[in-house]
Amino acid sequence: LTNVFPNIVEKTKVDENGLEYFIKVTDNINQKNESKSKIAEKIFSFKKPIVTYSLIFICILVFILMYVLGNGSTDNYTLLVFGANVDTLTKNGDYYRLFTSMFLHIGILHLLCNMYSLYIIGKEVENVFGKVKYLIIYLLSGIAGSILSLAFNHNTICAGASGAIFGLLGALLYFGYYYRTYL
């Protein structure tokens, strides 16, 4: 070995005795693990999903109001009055429908499926990204979903939080890939 690597003895020589060197290396490893542990603890510590609960509350409240103030969540006129997305109105200047439609749901099953999905996925995304980033992801994804809905559904009333929820799922997939060493 010394023939191949003539400087190996000088390079591997340690001034400390073996035990002191072992303790020093172990301490360095422990410090690095402790700092990584703090990062993981910060990322994965549970926080109350207030934004998720608020979004669910808003969707349920709007659903109830559609029955109290209109003819229910499956009535086309009521959906349009409450801000459902339809290409003829949105393209003629009712751009608010890109936003409002993500809080409307057509029928109880649509509402229940979306709110269950929002609860399961939303609380995780809110926990790892924080309240502000979570809300930004939700709203931008919902608007993007509304725009895509306009592109593919002509003369069709569109509503629901599915676009926003798929955006949250995408954010969760990104998180899983980016932080895969912590999972």
Locations of regions flagged by a protein language model:
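A detector for small-residue-rich transmembrane helices and their helix-helix packing motifs
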Residues: 1-183
